[in-house]
Curated annotation (Swiss-Prot):
<feature type="region of interest" description="Disordered">
    <location>
        <begin position="1"/>
        <end position="24"/>
    </location>
</feature>
<feature type="modified residue" description="Phosphoserine">
    <location>
        <position position="18"/>
    </location>
</feature>
<protein>
    <recommendedName>
        <fullName>Ankyrin repeat, SAM and basic leucine zipper domain-containing protein 1</fullName>
    </recommendedName>
</protein>
<keyword id="KW-0943">RNA-mediated gene silencing</keyword>
<dbReference type="GO" id="GO:0031047">
    <property type="term" value="P:regulatory ncRNA-mediated gene silencing"/>
</dbReference>
<keyword id="KW-0040">ANK repeat</keyword>
<feature type="repeat" description="ANK 4">
    <location>
        <begin position="148"/>
        <end position="177"/>
    </location>
</feature>
<feature type="repeat" description="ANK 1">
    <location>
        <begin position="45"/>
        <end position="74"/>
    </location>
</feature>
<dbReference type="GO" id="GO:0010526">
    <property type="term" value="P:transposable element silencing"/>
</dbReference>
<feature type="modified residue" description="Phosphoserine">
    <location>
        <position position="17"/>
    </location>
</feature>
<comment type="subunit">
    <text>Interacts with DDX4, PIWIL1, RANBP9 and TDRD1.</text>
</comment>
<dbReference type="GO" id="GO:0007283">
    <property type="term" value="P:spermatogenesis"/>
</dbReference>
<dbReference type="Pfam" id="PF12796">
    <property type="entry name" value="Ank_2"/>
</dbReference>
<dbReference type="Pfam" id="PF07647">
    <property type="entry name" value="SAM_2"/>
</dbReference>
<dbReference type="GO" id="GO:0071546">
    <property type="term" value="C:pi-body"/>
</dbReference>
<dbReference type="InterPro" id="IPR042650">
    <property type="entry name" value="Asz1_SAM"/>
</dbReference>
<feature type="repeat" description="ANK 2">
    <location>
        <begin position="78"/>
        <end position="107"/>
    </location>
</feature>
């Protein structure tokens, strides 16, 4: 891997240098001598040994050669310094040694900084993080851009290094800087499908509404690259954690980031992004996200919103256009409530059979809607926790609510059974009551039968006349 890294310096945008393949770095067995190097080897031979020592990562030999007079900022093929090479292979130990010897952490070659080289290195995130931290500690600028105007945080976001992104922001990296194509770090993360990076950047204040040069937002970039979870996440207009860490000091932010990321790795939790409440989801589905702040300021819950009267809508500053959307949704959801508790005792006793039947039919319809809703949730609920787009609270909270639901359903079943038994009892008593007066519709049954028979007779007689007339015409 070291050899491939040295074949040519990384060019911003993924290209490779068109210069000679002879980069001056060779890999092979290093014939180390036991003699003291200082003053005994020609300078060119020292440089050659220095290159080989860098290539194989021999830290002790590098230190020995530096002691012999090799400049820590000497340049090789393509103008790279030893520090830039060490950063390109994420060799944190070499980076530390070179920095301690006075290497320039702010060195650039063709708009390629050492920090960018470290952020785009091929290696483990742990080693890359150490290199970046060392460079930042020596005042490397986290906002220096390459030829394509890409900054270190964009490279880190593109390659999926969450902790590196957080560390750069803690040291002053601009989250919403755009490159020559209008891509931000968030856009790069969405393009590459790095959900963890997307969540972290949102938490650090990334603006998901910024568009690329061709007018695409990060959510659209994610959708185009078939990253549907990220598309769903970025499609929400609300971002309750946006900029949550921006008000902290650098030291507090670093501590917060490293502690949080460590805990996440242990617990396999991939973000601290808070799930949306039922009110936000309901408003988002109707395209009424702009009402969220208004309703929250007035402490209006979803249930309160669904039971509001027209005068209450107006009183709370909800426009007629928005009212129509909410009322249409209410009609579709069938959330009408029958409140017998508001009726007087006399009214309860005088309720008609039609009204009572209507109540039972509506109650049954409501139960049908509830069953359908629960079945839809069961169908859509991911069986794999890794597929959940937004972070959820503890599963214990959900199971406890489900247990309460089961108890309520059992209570409802018990009450309905009692109601059924009561109705059956009333029906039996009525059938056995000799004083029961037959209802008018029952009395009129014979009349209706007579009318039906009369109508059939008339129709038959008319049909007979028609046959006779037809026969007469033929004759």
């Amino acid at each position: 891997m070291a050899a491939s890294a040295l074949r040519g310096p990384p060019v911003a945008g993924g290209g490779e240098s068109s210069e000679s393949e002879d980069d001056g770095w060779e890999i092979g067995y290093l014939d180390r001598t036991s003699q003291k190097l200082k003053g005994l080897l020609p300078i060119e031979e020292k440089k050659e040994k220095f290159k080989k020592a860098m290539t194989i990562g021999d830290v002790s030999l590098v230190q020995e050669l530096l002691d012999s007079g090799i400049s820590v900022d000497s340049t090789f093929q393509y103008g790279w310094t030893p520090l830039m090479y060490a950063a390109s292979v994420a060799n944190a130990e070499l980076v530390r040694v070179l920095l301690d010897r006075g290497a320039n952490a702010s060195f650039e070659k063709d708009k390629q900084s050492i920090l960018i080289t470290a952020c785009s290195a091929h290696g483990s995130e742990e080693q890359i993080l150490k290199c970046v931290e060392l460079l930042l500690s020596r005042n490397a600028d986290p906002n220096v851009a390459c030829r394509r105007l890409m900054t270190p945080i964009m490279y880190a976001a593109r390659d999926g290094h969450t902790q590196v992104v957080a560390l750069l922001v803690a040291h002053g990296a601009e989250v919403n800087t755009q490159d020559e194509n209008g891509y931000t770090a968030l856009t790069w993360a969405a393009r590459q499908g790095h959900k963890n990076i997307v969540l972290k950047l949102l938490e650090l204040g990334a603006n998901k509404m910024l568009q690329t040069k061709d007018g695409k937002m990060p959510s659209e970039i994610a959708k185009r690259n078939k990253h549907h979870e990220i598309f769903n996440l970025l499609s929400f207009t609300l971002n309750p954690l946006e900029g949550r860490l921006q008000q902290l000091t650098k030291e507090d932010t670093i501590c917060k980031i490293l502690t949080t990321d460590s805990d996440r790795e242990k617990d396999h939790i991939f973000s601290s992004y808070t799930a949306f409440g039922d009110l936000e989801v309901f408003l988002h589905g109707l395209g009424l996200e702009h009402m969220t702040d208004l309703l929250k300021e007035r402490d209006i819950t979803l249930r309160h919103l669904l039971t509001m009267r027209e005068d209450e809508f107006t009183k709370n500053g909800i426009t007629s256009k928005d009212q129509q959307k909410i009322l249409a949704a209410l009609k579709e959801l069938q959330v009408e409530e029958i409140q017998f508790g508001e009726l007087s005792e006399e009214t309860k006793l005088e309720i008609s059979g039609d009204e009572f039947l209507n109540f039972l039919l509506k109650l049954n319809k409501q139960c049908g809607h509830l069953i359908t809703a629960v079945q839809n949730v069961i169908t859509e609920l991911p069986v794999n926790s890794q597929k959940i787009t937004l972070e959820w609270a503890s599963p214990q909270n959900f199971t406890s609510v489900c247990e309460e639901l089961v108890n309520n359903v059992e209570d409802l079943s018990e009450k309905v059974c009692k109601l059924k038994d009561l109705i059956q009892k009333l029906q039996n008593e009525r059938e056995n009551d000799p004083t029961h007066i037959q209802l008018r519709e029952e009395v009129s049954t014979w009349n209706s039968r007579i009318l039906k028979r009369t109508a059939i007779t008339i129709c038959g007689f008319g049909f007979l006349l028609f046959i006779c007339k037809l026969t007469f015409q033929r004759k």
